[in-house]
Amino acid sequence: MSAKTLYEKLVESHTIRELDNEGHVLLYIDRSILNEYTSPQAFSGLRERGRAVRHPDTFLLNIDHVNPTRSQRDVLMTDPGGQLQVDYFRENAADFGITLFDVLDPRQGIEHVVAHEQGLVMPGMVIAAGDSHTTTYGAFGALGFGIGTSEIEHLLATQTLVYRKLKTMRVSVQGELPFACSAKDIVLELLERIGADGATGYAIEFVGEAISALSVEGRMTLCNMAVEAGARGAIIAPDKKVFDYIYGKPQMPVGELWQQALLEWSQLSSDADAVFDKTVAINCHDLEPKVTWGISPDQTGSITGRVPFPEQETNPLKRLALEKALHYMGLTAGMLLKDIRISHAFIGSCTNGRIEDLRAVAKVLEGRKIASHVRGIIVPGSTMVRRQAEEEGLAKIFIAAGFEWRQSGCSMCLAMNEDVLSPGDRCASGTNRNFLGRQGAGARTHLMSPAMVAAAAVAGHLVDVRSLLQAGE
């Protein structure tokens, strides 16, 4: 028997049958979480064809994209289109017998935060959802990937998908993560190295001592943003940290079933002599806090660096892309990144809206105030995260520093709700995408870790968070 990667093992164990000689298989899907934005047409397709949902208990419907996050919760959406989406979503949940986490549900939140809170993500699973950041679940030793609306309809009706197998990429991250650096900095470093299409057609497996040292929530950040390099899957072999993290969550097995599951999950790893199609090596020794300066997550650099000079790029297409990015971002080639003034600071999203992220933010903000010209917004990834942050006293620190403390939702990660930036606004953001207009038409986004966002809010401009923290904190 030939050696296999973990990705290959997961796909093989879920393959119902081969469909051709080009790598297409019929794949069984264990779980899916759907939101109000990408699923309406899929349910309409079921209704038109008179089809039922094959296994309603394997799906969760969750409102997160269009709901307001202002402090006073309301079941009504401010946007009429958003209200139609939510109303139809509620109707679909009732008619097809699928559990719904509505806006006022104490379990509501961003789908990729809620799923693991509820124990819906288990090692060895294959999970598909109508959101590209479904790769997040690789942090648990599961294969997660995003799908389109027509695929959602097929999945609802059959519990399967036509899937094309990917090539494999091994990303080895060695060394100790430097002071004030995080998983966000690792993934931005990876993006800077391989580009926004460097993993297109691949499933990434992250390995190495730096990965083992990351918390489970840090691993989620890493896998979440792997899709920004084009990867349609990102996996980390599960270990004791993962097993301890998921133990006791609502949908997890208990008693003897838990022990049996542990035995199976402990075997989930790539074979020692497995061959990957591509390998990338990163040493954390010289890693510094990272920020993006452009309009793609791979247009990034260390906070101690400068905005690049397009004329130094020999590839004409890349040079044109640099010129376009600097024009949109209103930046001058050669300027120090730490001199870029901001108007907004946003912390949240499925990338960095978990309790560990908020603790890092509180460490920076405690005893400090944000700059008078900066509007700061913190949106917890779920209602459960919000409650925990309040119980730990973090929310008081945020409010005292001048941040708005909101309810859970996707919020300012994308301009799809009332949390939208205006043209010319510049935001330090703990999110995953800095595309043109991502946070609002004409708005400018700089991606970075939550701690870096907090530091920028205090300084009023991009700044090295290390200057605000003492080594060893």
Swiss-Prot record:
InterPro entries for this protein: 3-IsopropMal_deHydase_lsu (IPR004430), Acnase/IPM_dHydase_lsu_aba_1/3 (IPR015931), Acoase/IPM_deHydtase_lsu_aba (IPR001030), Aconitase_4Fe-4S_BS (IPR018136), Aconitase_4Fe-4S_dom (IPR036008), IPM_dehydratase_rel_enz (IPR050067), IPMI_cat (IPR033941)
- Quote the catalytic activity from the record: (2R,3S)-3-isopropylmalate = (2S)-2-isopropylmalate
Residues that coordinate or bind [4Fe-4S] cluster = C350, C410, C413
The molecular function GO annotations come to: 3-isopropylmalate dehydratase activity; 4 iron, 4 sulfur cluster binding; metal ion binding
> Which superkingdom, per the lineage?
Bacteria
Q: Which pathway does the database say it acts in?
A: Amino-acid biosynthesis; L-leucine biosynthesis; L-leucine from 3-methyl-2-oxobutanoate: step 2/4
On whether Ribonucleoprotein is a keyword of this UniProt record, the answer is: no
The free-text note explaining how the cofactor binds reads: Binds 1 [4Fe-4S] cluster per subunit.
Stated EC number for the protein is: 4.2.1.33
Q: Which cofactors are required for activity?
A: [4Fe-4S] cluster
Which Gene Ontology BP terms does the record give?
Answer: L-leucine biosynthetic process
Keywords from UniProt, A to Z, are: 4Fe-4S, Amino-acid biosynthesis, Branched-chain amino acid biosynthesis, Iron, Iron-sulfur, Leucine biosynthesis, Lyase, Metal-binding
> Membrane-spanning regions, if any?
none
Q: Mind telling me which PANTHER family this protein's record contains?
A: 3-ISOPROPYLMALATE DEHYDRATASE, HOMOACONITASE, MITOCHONDRIAL-RELATED
Q: What job does this protein perform?
A: Catalyzes the isomerization between 2-isopropylmalate and 3-isopropylmalate, via the formation of 2-isopropylmaleate.
Spell out the family assignment given in the record's similarity comment: Belongs to the aconitase/IPM isomerase family. LeuC type 1 subfamily.
Subunit-level organization: Heterodimer of LeuC and LeuD.
Q: What is this protein called?
A: 3-isopropylmalate dehydratase large subunit 2
Species of origin reads Salmonella choleraesuis (strain SC-B67)
